[in-house]
């Protein structure tokens, strides 16, 4: 049975997504990846609504069996609050769709994909490119991170 996994890299300004399938023979295929962007000048409520609506659309389009998301941890205080608000909207939408969720810390993703938990961003992106047989490094970074989360989930099942 084909399994669809959607990786999400939470953010208020840019939310990365990456959708992959795991085939019955365990081979991996990229369906799509990209970002949901919100305008910095908009009020926070409007930005969260954009995430809410666009994420519903993504879920209807990809129909994932599982969603992988970065586990929340603290950044700078102002950024932490904004990411937490966006993450709350993401969790709400996932609950509305009754989707299974796996959470990973950045160190878990790095360890799974590169073999060491202190890998830099380029090492992770090269691992994503290699595992998914992409012609070039996935861009932008938020989408690459989302693909890395989806890949990590595929290896953990």
Swiss-Prot record:
GO cellular component: cytoplasm; Holliday junction resolvase complex
Positions contributing to Mg(2+) 1 binding: 9, 142
EC number annotated for this UniProt entry: 3.1.21.10
Record's subcellular location: Cytoplasm
InterPro entries cross-referenced by the UniProt entry: RNaseH-like_sf, RNaseH_sf, X-over_junc_endoDNase_Mg_BS, X-over_junc_endoDNase_RuvC
Catalytic activity: Endonucleolytic cleavage at a junction such as a reciprocal single-stranded crossover between two homologous DNA duplexes (Holliday junction)
Cofactor binding mode and count: Binds 2 Mg(2+) ion per subunit.
Primary enzyme class: hydrolase
Main localization (coarse): cytoplasm
An example molecular function term from Gene Ontology annotations: crossover junction DNA endonuclease activity
Domain of life according to the entry: Bacteria
Annotated positions binding Mg(2+) 2: 70
GO BP annotations listed: DNA recombination; DNA repair
CDD domains in UniProt: RuvC
UniProt keyword terms in alphabetical order: Cytoplasm, DNA damage, DNA recombination, DNA repair, DNA-binding, Endonuclease, Hydrolase, Magnesium, Metal-binding, Nuclease
Active-site residues, Swiss-Prot/TrEMBL: 9, 70, 142
Family: Belongs to the RuvC family.
The protein's assembly and partners: Homodimer which binds Holliday junction (HJ) DNA. The HJ becomes 2-fold symmetrical on binding to RuvC with unstacked arms; it has a different conformation from HJ DNA in complex with RuvA. In the full resolvosome a probable DNA-RuvA(4)-RuvB(12)-RuvC(2) complex forms which resolves the HJ.
Known role: The RuvA-RuvB-RuvC complex processes Holliday junction (HJ) DNA during genetic recombination and DNA repair. Endonuclease that resolves HJ intermediates. Cleaves cruciform DNA by making single-stranded nicks across the HJ at symmetrical positions within the homologous arms, yielding a 5'-phosphate and a 3'-hydroxyl group; requires a central core of homology in the junction. The consensus cleavage sequence is 5'-(A/T)TT(C/G)-3'. Cleavage occurs on the 3'-side of the TT dinucleotide at the point of strand exchange.
Protein name as catalogued: Crossover junction endodeoxyribonuclease RuvC
Organism: Cyanothece sp. (strain PCC 7425 / ATCC 29141)
Gene coding for it: ruvC
């Amino acid at each position: 049975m084909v399994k669809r996994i959607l990786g999400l890299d939470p953010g208020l300004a840019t939310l990365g997504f990456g959708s992959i399938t795991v085939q019955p023979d365990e081979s991996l295929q990229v369906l799509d990846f990209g970002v949901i962007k919100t305008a910095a000048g908009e009020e926070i409520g409007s930005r969260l609504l954009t995430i809410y609506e666009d994420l519903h659309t993504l879920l209807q389009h990809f129909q994932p069996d599982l969603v992988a998301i970065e586990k929340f941890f603290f950044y700078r205080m102002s950024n932490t609050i904004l990411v937490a608000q966006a993450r709350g909207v993401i969790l709400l939408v996932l609950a509305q769709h009754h989707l299974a969720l796996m959470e990973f810390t950045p160190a878990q993703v790095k360890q799974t994909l590169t073999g060491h938990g202190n890998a830099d961003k380029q090492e992770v992106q090269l691992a994503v490119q290699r595992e998914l047989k992409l012609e070039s490094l996935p861009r932008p970074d938020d989408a690459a991170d989302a693909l890395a989360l989806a890949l990590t989930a595929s290896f953990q099942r």
